[in-house]
Amino acid sequence: MSRRGLVAGPDLEYFQRRYFTPAEVAQHNRPEDLWVSYLGRVYDLTSLAQAYKGNLLLKPIVEVAGQDISHWFDPKTRDIRKHIDPLTGCLRYCTPRGRFVHVPPQLPCSDWANDFGKPWWQGSYYEVGRLSAKTRSIRIINTLTSQEHTLEVGVLESIWEILHRYLPYNTHAASYTWKYEGKNLNMDFTLEENGIRDEEEEFDYLSMDGTLHTPAILLYFNDDLTEL
């Protein structure tokens, strides 16, 4: 991806989005591309899956690839839920799907390697961002080409983050002025902060289909000397 030329803002070559939608997480549902979400965060476990490829302990994780697994965790401790093991009477991790990577065996075992450091669910090593608790749709219209695209975005995403989502449709999106109802958008603000209200609850209250009215952002091309 080329740099942004004369347009003010972050260098999109290194730009990192903060939020991911559940639909985006769901797309990463294979052992070679494995994401999960839990407790409001999104994690890329692809490297973990590659490191334990062929290991039976990976099976419960592969089965939930692309899904939210918050129910595996105690929200207070952010650790795997625990229970009293009926066989040993000891407090152990609760794994209804079966024991998985980094969970100790039920009984003492001499061949269990515990030199991996922190378990994969502790710390932020695999974290790639936050899970959008609420999403909304927004239309983006390129006034130069009359092309229109509808994106699902997180309500807490800035316009810069929405622009980053839009890049697959227009690699020069940063060379445009983004406007709503004739006013320039503050690219560091969210849609709501820019006056683009989320009216989903009002439509629900009125028993109306909210998809019939999706706000539109208009893009106006700037000749900023970037490559066309």
UniProtKB/Swiss-Prot annotation:
Lyase recorded as keyword: no
Species for this entry: Pongo abelii (Sumatran orangutan)
GO biological process, one term: regulation of cilium beat frequency
Protein name as it appears in the record: Cytochrome b5 domain-containing protein 1
PROSITE patterns: CYTOCHROME_B5_2
Superkingdom to which the source organism belongs: Eukaryota
Transmembrane segments: none
Gene3D superfamilies: Cytochrome b5-like heme/steroid binding domain
Every Cytochrome b5 heme-binding domain range: 17-83
Compartments reported by the entry: Cytoplasm, Cytoskeleton, Cilium axoneme
Keywords: Cell projection, Cytoplasm, Cytoskeleton, Heme, Iron, Metal-binding
GO cellular component terms given for this protein: cell projection; cytoplasm; cytoskeleton
Native organism taxonomy: Eukaryota, Metazoa, Chordata, Craniata, Vertebrata
Pfam families noted in UniProt: Cyt-b5 (PF00173)
Designated gene of the protein: CYB5D1
InterPro entries membership: Cyt_B5-like_heme/steroid-bd (IPR001199), Cyt_B5-like_heme/steroid_sf (IPR036400), Cytochrome_b5_domain (IPR052320)
GO terms assigned for molecular function: metal ion binding
Protein family according to the UniProt entry: Belongs to the cytochrome b5 family.
Keyword Heme in annotation: yes
Binding site for heme: Y52, H83
Record's function text: Radial spoke stalk protein that binds heme under oxidizing conditions. Required for the coordinated beating of multiple cilia maybe by functioning in a redox signaling pathway.
